[in-house]
């Protein structure tokens, strides 16, 4: 078979199809992942070979610019130190070493922080939350964390409870649909929730925000950029005390969102990375050259039929596509699950819990799980559909690509991402994303499964990620 690059130079030979088409009536998008640090001599996080760039919101202040080498330098309560050690966070990651002195300074200052997936940003803001809370007031809300999905909110709640397990008096509520009783309202000193539910609780006077000291917005670029979520975040912020400390965290901050974030968190200290430093080095990024849209599904089943992959996530574009691929894969003898926004809250919780525990090994999902969710056992992510944005999917979505592949290669482990391309549009979109981040993509061919298996297993069997890791074969851009 001729490769895709040659086929797209002769459009007549390619199958004219759009990304809204599906594998025999399927379509596409979704994602997954959880985890505490594993690790031997440190937190076990994905460490970088670059320095974090810091910009002070007010250069005239005496904000600390130093980088800590141990958590003990921060003067944290012993309960937090014990919790970090219990979670195997033995020393700060680079993002934690630079961010924590700034976030814990007094008087409190706002922060806009950008860091790769799996580098410890959640741990950084969780330590800040626990440090700001008076545990003698277990039922008085003092810190609020906002997340774009119930899955991520539940995960953050779990991390706070784990690191804060020795903090007597810590109570963490999840403000997600169906979780807070209308009779009791919020009775916790830390609240993690989605913007719509939080806003509703405040309006019904079931969430006392008068003593809130800290607001954290995780996956802030997505939260502020989406019309509905962005408006809800602003409304929630306007209901909170004017003196509240605001922390915005994300792996990506597109320019148009960055200016909005600076208004949302004024005079914020900022931490950022250069564009080419955003992709996680422990992820070997590949692409599969599929003969046509129809044959994408056959290639997918062949991939899972030949290899022992472990936990993996398949991202598709639509709910219908996720359901159709699940139906067809199960009919072909594969054990898979689908998770997307059409499922009710408790059912979504159970599906994700089953995936975390290993009861389910393959999760087909849309972008509802592309951000923040950590399942440390995920060794492969498949972009069945290349992420696109704009009316009619007019342009590639580089930020969503980065968040999707960040579901693997967590906490210093290695991982594989495989993006499926089948025509001029999908190939051009992936090429644009690769150029955007300076990625050398490794080509896989459905005509040589022995070679494909060697390349993929070469990565998965590697014990830990190295900064420059890639399989030992020729790369193709």
UniProtKB/Swiss-Prot annotation:
Motif interval(s): DEAD box: 218-221
EC number: 3.6.4.13
Protein's UniProt keywords contain Membrane: yes
Organism classification: Eukaryota, Fungi, Dikarya, Ascomycota, Pezizomycotina
Top-level taxon of the source organism: Eukaryota
Region feature (Disordered): 1-45
Pfam families with a match to the protein in the record: DEAD, Helicase_C
Species this chain originates from: Pyricularia oryzae (strain 70-15 / ATCC MYA-4617 / FGSC 8958)
Protein's UniProt name: ATP-dependent RNA helicase DBP5
